[in-house]
Structures are given as structure tokens and as C-alpha cells.
Curated annotation (Swiss-Prot):
GO CC entries: cytoplasm
Pfam families: CTP_transf_like (PF01467)
Compartment(s) where it occurs, according to its Swiss-Prot or TrEMBL record: Cytoplasm
Listed name of the protein: Phosphopantetheine adenylyltransferase
NCBIfam families: coaD_prev_kdtB (TIGR01510), cyt_tran_rel (TIGR00125)
Entry EC number(s): 2.7.7.3
Pathway(s) where this gene product acts: Cofactor biosynthesis; coenzyme A biosynthesis; CoA from (R)-pantothenate: step 4/5
Gene of this entry: coaD
Gene3D superfamilies documented for this protein: HUPs
GO molecular function terms listed in the Swiss-Prot or TrEMBL record: ATP binding; pantetheine-phosphate adenylyltransferase activity
Length: 166
């Protein structure tokens, strides 16, 4: 069996992410969940917070290890960790088109590195970290869309923001 990485910003990690990661953990010897930084995104949680939340979520899965590599190319991280595959989740055709393009770049950088695409369940196909943040910003309840530690952290962020406005 080979090792794989599942890179993402995970701001925050959602039930859709968890579903894909849990499924992929059964396919590989080791799955590294890699907290990365996307320079085009504005983050709600710090890198350290995202790392801690993801570690809490997967603390009982010995095949999953959560690490942070904020300023590296995905291909470089895969090389460092001895991973032969990159796992990505798909919700819809827009995700497919985006992931196909990224997989093409990664394949150009390393012809031996494969991308494995896993679909989320249809009932989770609408969940995105951006949608979660937007819903929380306006006071909506997302507790059924994210793991419990994430729901608690989102509630705390919202409470702190509301206290700052007073």
C-alpha cells in the first residue's frame, strides 16, 4: 500500500471533508491531512487553530496524521512525505473541472504522482467551508454540517466577534 496526502485549507473542516478523509484512510497505508495556505483566501481560523481542530476530529483514526505545510507546493509535500497519491474530494462538476486542472499541473511537475478523486455523499454535496463561514457570520446554525469540535470553535469565534462589536 502507498501513502497519500489530502491537502486543503480546511477553514473550517466540514463533514464533507471528514467523509472523504475517512473513506480515503481505508485505501492507503497512511493518509496525511495537510493544512495548507491558499494566498487568495481570507481565513477565519489561524493555521494553528485549523491544525488543532483537524487533529481533534481525527484523533481516533491512527491511519490519519494531520500536519501543516503552509508555504509549499503540494507536489513538494508529497515528495517529503513519500506519498504516491494526492486525494481530493468532489461535490459537483465545478469541483471536477477545478481538480482536473490542478491534477494536470501536479502531473506535469511529477509524472509519477497520481490524483485520486472521491465523491462526497449527495446530501453533503452542497457543503463548503465558504458557505459555512457565511452562514455563521449571519448567525445561522451549522452544527449538522461540521464536526462537533468545529461547531464549538465557530460558536466561540462568533461570540468573540459579537462581544467586540459591543
Amino acid at each position: 500500500m502507498i501513502k497519500a496526502i489530502f491537502p486543503g485549507s480546511f477553514d473550517p473542516i466540514t463533514n464533507g471533508h471528514v467523509e472523504v478523509i475517512e473513506g480515503a484512510s481505508h485505501m492507503f497505508e497512511k493518509l496525511y491531512v495537510v493544512i495548507m495556505t491558499n494566498t487568495s483566501k481570507k481565513y477565519l481560523f489561524t493555521e494553528k487553530e485549523r491544525l488543532e481542530l483537524a487533529r481533534k476530529v481525527f484523533e481516533n483514526n491512527e491511519k490519519v496524521e494531520v500536519i501543516a505545510r503552509p508555504a509549499e507546493l503540494t507536489v513538494e509535500v508529497a515528495h517529503e512525505l513519500g506519498a504516491g497519491a494526492i486525494v481530493r474530494g468532489l461535490r459537483n462538476t465545478a469541483d471536477f473541472n477545478y481538480e482536473r486542472d490542478i491534477a494536470g499541473i501536479n502531473k506535469t511537475l511529477d509524472p509519477d504522482l497520481n490524483t485520486v478523486l472521491l465523491f462526497t455523499r449527495p446530501e453533503d454535496s452542497f457543503i463548503s467551508s465558504s458557505m459555512i463561514k457565511e452562514t455563521v457570520f449571519f448567525g445561522g446554525d451549522v452544527s449538522t454540517l461540521v464536526p462537533k469540535p468545529v461547531a464549538a470553535a465557530l460558536e466561540e469565534k462568533l461570540r468573540n466577534r459579537n462581544n467586540e462589536k459591543k
